[in-house]
Amino acid sequence: MLFDYINALLKKPTLRTPIWVMRQAGRYLPEYRETRIKAGDFLTLCKSPELACEVTMQPIDRFDLDAAILFSDILTIPDAMGLGLYFLEGEGPKFSNPLNTLSSIEQLKKPNVGNELSYVTDAVSVIKKALNNKVPLIGFTGSPWTLATYMVEGGSSKNFVKVKGLMYENPVYMHQLLDKLSDIIIDYLNGQIQVGVDSVMIFDTWGGLLNKQSYEDFSLQYMTKIVNGIKRKFNGKTIPITLFTKGGAMWLEQIANSGCDGVALDWTVELNDAQQRIGAKVALQGNLDPCVLYASPEKIREEVKKILSQFQGDTGHVFNLGHGISPDVNPEHMKVLVDVVHEFSKR
């Protein structure tokens, strides 16, 4: 089956500009909040294939979206490596066994992805059955650098002094960690592809913390390794891959040279500028400021039309926000967004 989302990433003809939204299955939906209560806690929600399917399908059932994204968390990999992931209400993710010594990096185990992360591939199988070819399914991972920031800091951070200190003081150990994570991620994404995801995305949430040389050495190098390591053809279909470095507008050319099919943009770069810079090489995803969804429906329509009018051509653009949708957005405003994108981009 031909999907506009896949075709846009591969620069094939589309009937309209496809749209999906980062965190489209999430707390802004009342049905998600009900499922979250039923699960008891966030990790249980992630680790139950049936519940993960339920929340993945909620935005697909409610809105006319062009893709579903697997409901999971980027930190499932470090959890499987023995770091002990847990969540505190209002504080985000924490690790009970962070990488706070050089020896802890050396001794870090490489999990058997097929066994220890089987709940993720099981969820993909359940979701694919539920989707019944209505829309494609996106698999994903965090980038090695982004995973490393949480693993070394022990959770979220305001200034990231531990991980950046390790990078500057002991780059050999940092590279050892990133290389190990890259190998695991390749296995992880290939596992998702083998059970049915139609495309994959790498979220480099914290790549924008770095300067140009550090970004190339400690983030982009390893994402490029992953791009080269995953199955790009499977079961007769092409599996496109999208990279997203939040705060990465200055490195668009380098990201586009990684071999990826799509580059996701945050809202700090103009879409027409990005298209001039890299549009000949890759498809673009983005890039409405998530806070626009707090505005009136009329303003949402106006801002969406601005972005759509910036893009030149009939394919190669996937509409999205420049980051995840906020938890307190009115779901009706999400519906306005989706409907307006389709209305104004119909070929």
UniProtKB/Swiss-Prot annotation:
Which pathway does the record list? Porphyrin-containing compound metabolism; protoporphyrin-IX biosynthesis; coproporphyrinogen-III from 5-aminolevulinate: step 4/4
Q: What does this protein do?
A: Catalyzes the decarboxylation of four acetate groups of uroporphyrinogen-III to yield coproporphyrinogen-III.
Keyword Acyltransferase tagged? no
| Reactions catalysed | uroporphyrinogen III + 4 H(+) = coproporphyrinogen III + 4 CO2
Location of this chain's protein in the cell: Cytoplasm
Which key words are in the record?
Answer: Cytoplasm, Decarboxylase, Lyase, Porphyrin biosynthesis
Q: What is this protein called?
A: Uroporphyrinogen decarboxylase
- Originating organism: Ruthia magnifica subsp. Calyptogena magnifica
What EC number(s) does this enzyme carry?
A: 4.1.1.37
- What is known about its subunit structure? Homodimer.
Q: What is its main location?
A: cytoplasm
What's in the GO CC field? Answer: cytosol
Cross-referenced Gene3D superfamilies, in alphabetical order? 3.20.20.210
The family classification in the record reads: Belongs to the uroporphyrinogen decarboxylase family.
User: What biological processes does GO assign it?
Assistant: protoporphyrinogen IX biosynthetic process from glutamate
Q: Which GO terms describe its molecular function?
A: uroporphyrinogen decarboxylase activity
Database matches in PANTHER family = METHYLTETRAHYDROFOLATE:HOMOCYSTEINE METHYLTRANSFERASE RELATED, UROPORPHYRINOGEN DECARBOXYLASE
The source's superkingdom equals: Bacteria
